[in-house]
């Protein structure tokens, strides 16, 4: 396509990108990558980019999904769209197949899975609680949505709808989503087990609202749009008073600012809420 790059620079960039893509493809196993980060130069799988302890590829990590299998699947799908190389679509679909295989029948994903060698991946560690932070539900859902957009295959749509339906059901009555989800109780909770506790940290509201918006765009089902409006209503209700009129990162079951982790005391900022409300205004024209 048209570009403002010189021919030489375009060729060099293409060469650099394809080298990286081909290199990372070598580390895909049965559709998945072992980690969201690898220790250079030995390429030993590590937990995250800021907790680089090695785990020797014993599991597949879904939290911090932008850097793991769901995010890499989207990267290869983008590479296919830009470069037109069928290999990259194949790699993205293999990642998608792994994501679908790991999905719980109720539509959610857990933090980690044992290496997938055959049949369904098995959950590693706690299988009584999952979460909404750091793209744990959002990134695999968006991979499925973009694969459906690119291929039109129903299997991607079906898995994406399962995820979307889970998020609608897991939304708190007040419109928020919490940090965690109790699988046994089928309810959202914060770090301390309190229900109906909204949370902006680590992209929780942004991520789930994005999935709802995409689900509405793909299916046209009103319940996804209604979920978005409920989320915006909660954001407006959670706004704190003068003089700053900001928002906390974490809320308790009474919709009051609360602690998160030990270094996350009750506090206030504009980050994480204001842009969501402006986006909802752009979409709805509702000035409230």
Task: Describe the residue ranges of each PLM region.
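Glycan-recognition and catalytic cores of secretory/periplasmic carbohydrate-active enzymes
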Residues: 1-288
